[in-house]
Amino acid sequence: MYARLDKDRLLVEVGQGRLVRRKLLLKWGTLAAAVIAGFVYLASFLWFAPGGEVENLNLVTQENREASMLVTTLEDGSVVYLAQESTLQYPEHFATDKREVNLQGEAFFDVAKNHEQTFLIETGKVRIEVLGTAFNVRSHEDDSFRLSVQRGRVKVSLKQGGQSVLVNAGETVTLQARQLQLSETGDSDEFRQYTKNIRFKDECLEDILRVVNAEAPTLQIQAASSVLNRRKLTIEFENNSPETVAELICWALSLKCSREGDKLILSE
C-alpha cells in the first residue's frame, strides 16, 4: 500500500505519527478531508462575560490560515468548520449553564443539542444564540455580517440597539446599515463548501470518524476499540472515498482495515 501511495505522491511524513496529506479529486458526495493548518495554543485569559463579569478561564484559540477548513470538535460534541483567515476562541471546559465561543471570520457550526446549556457565539457586533442546529457565520472587521441556517433555528441580536431576529432553516440574516435584514437563503448548496476540503489537527480518531461518517452514511468507518478511538491524529482529506479515507488513517496510525458488510473496521 505504501509503494502505491508513495508513487502517486500522496504521502508526506512529519515526525512521530505520520502526517498524511492526500490530494485526490475522487467524487464522494460532499466529503473531502484535509489537515495541517492554523495553530492551536492554550493559555489563561480573562473572559468577559455578559453583564460585565470577568472569569479567568483556560481558552483555546484556533487560527486557520489555510484554504481548507479546519475542523474542530468541541467538548460538548459540537463541530466547527473554521474557514481561511478566521479565528475561533473557546474555553477548555464550558460553564454549566452556557457554551460560549468567540468568532472572528467565517465558520460553519453543527451544534449539539443541549437545552440546559445555551450555545452562544460572540462576534464583533452580533451575538448568536442556539440550542442545537447547523448554520454558517461570516463576521469580519469591516462590519460585514451574514448568517444562514441549514437546519433548526437561531436567534441573532445586535449588541448595540437591541434588535433581535429569529432565523429559521432556509433563511439568511445580514447586517445592513446597522440593521438586521432577513431573507431566504439564495443558494441551498452553500453549506457543501465547508465539507469538501477539510482537515483535522491533533483530533481524536473518534471525532474524526464522526465527521467523516456523517458524509457517507452508506459505508461507515469504525475503530475496533475505545483505545483506538482515543488515538490522536493530524490528517487531511480532499474529495476522498470512504475506502481511501480508511486507507490513509491506517497508514498514519499503522493500522489494518477489514470490511464487514457496510462497515470498514480499523484495528491494530
Residue spans for each PLM region:
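Intrinsically disordered Ser/Thr phosphorylation hotspots
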Residues: M1, L31-A33
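A short, acidic loop/turn at secondary-structure junctions
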Residues: M1-E13
